[in-house]
Regions:
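Amphipathic alpha-helical packing elements
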Residues: 34-77
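Polar/charged low-complexity regulatory segments
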Residues: 1-36, 94-137
Length: 137
């Protein structure tokens, strides 16, 4: 299902994948525009906040105060952890491959089947699944 205002998992803020999507989910939920089945604060959102070493509720509070994505990311760096270039490289590689030959592969196969994508060999990762699922109207 296409959701206006929800960016791709692949899009980067400050070089970091998924962070912008987490912010979008926070904002959309506050506006009542995020479907209930979108995990908030768990799954990849939780991984992202753990990577930055900030608590999800604190990120929600800061995001809803306003500011650009870059300002909120800088807040995360100040309150939590500013990852180095190599850490970001490893994070991005890890996240963009989730679902491909790992512990998320079973979940991905189930979700593909539920959404009618079982035949889609191009969907090999969770990020690919998000992209395909959200392209559907």
């Amino acid at each position: 299902m296409k959701i206006s205002g929800l960016r791709s998992s692949y899009e980067k803020v400050g070089g970091i994948v998924f962070f912008g999507r987490t912010l979008d989910k926070i904002r959309l939920h506050a506006q009542g525009k995020l479907p209930a089945d979108y995990n908030r604060g768990t799954g990849f959102d939780s991984r992202c906040t753990r990577f930055l070493k900030v608590e999800y509720p604190a990120l929600v509070e800061r995001t809803l105060q306003g500011g650009t994505d870059e300002e909120i990311l800088e807040w995360c760096f100040q309150k939590g952890h500013r990852p180095g270039e190599e850490e970001i490289l490893v994070w991005n590689a890890f996240m963009t491959k989730r679902g491909w030959r790992d512990d998320v592969s079973g979940w991905l196969a189930q979700e593909k089947k539920k959404r009618g994508f079982a035949h889609r060999d191009d969907i090999q990762t969770a990020f690919d699944f998000h992209k395909a699922d959200e392209a559907e109207d």
